Amino acid sequence: DRGRVYYYMEDYSNAKKELLEATKKDNTEALLLLGMVYLAQDDVENAQAMYKQYISAVGDSAKGYNGLALCDIRNGDYDSALDNITKGLPTATTDEMQSLLFNEIVAYEKKLDFATALTKAQEYVDMFPEDSAAKKELAFLKTRTSSEG
């Protein structure tokens, strides 16, 4: 648990040290957190490796696929991100689904597919009306799509 605390304190070098130790003890949650640490340090390659290891250890996992999607978005591979989001949705809890669907909006927006991003954002805000960041995103996307035609 110290690795998690270090991660949230943004002390990534200590987090990495603790989490690497935990992975040696077959702690699969540590793989997930290690992926987050690597991604926070812009080490996308190692982050992807951790998320893939996590998925192979626990099976299909919304958290693992969401991590891979975040790596793909960081790398500019939006189609792969959307593929990983699709793979993660069937096993997602409500919180995980919220994260996956928000990242889906981001991926479409980064692809400059504002019409699809707008549709996804409207669906998202209907499902998660309390998400103020998504409401801002929706307002932004409306400006992007109304000026297209």
Regions flagged by a language model, labelled:
Residues 1, 33-36, 67, 103, ...:
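Canonical tetratricopeptide repeat
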Residues 4, 29-32, 63, 96-99, ...:
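Start-of-helix register in tetratricopeptide repeats
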Residues 8-9, 40-41, 74-75, 110, ...:
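Register position in tetratricopeptide repeats
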Residues 21-22, 53-54, 87-88, 123-124:
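Canonical positions in the second alpha-helix
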Residues 24-27, 59, 93-95, 129:
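Short coil turns that delineate tetratricopeptide repeat
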